[in-house]
């Protein structure tokens, strides 16, 4: 993602005033910006494109994480749990690897950055403080 430059930036309305949003916009001053109420309709519309993942990767979506950022690593029965946790600060990838299972697995085809980073890290710190005897692998 070293040289990534989006063709368009979408910002959910409740994410537009965060410092990270302003920083990202300052990095791409010439890129068109569209403020949206929420990303559900945007994502649904993108899925109707002949190449939803490829076309959406050219856009950047800025939004707030709504409390899902720290969670157990997804697993399925009958596999043993690895006891890992994931911390989501972003979703997606700008690469086009044809073998990538994530292109079919992810429900959001856009490159997405969660801009409420301070809140995410505060929530993580609270979880760690509330569980001092638990070992977390993140």
Q: What is each of the regions a protein language model found here?
A:
Residues 63-79, 102-138:
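Conserved Radical SAM active-site core
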Residues 39-42, 84-91, 117-119:
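Short, glycine/charge-rich beta-strand/loop segments that flank catalytic centers
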Residues 10, 34-35, 86, 98, ...:
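A structural signal for short, well-ordered beta-strand segments and their strand-loop junctions
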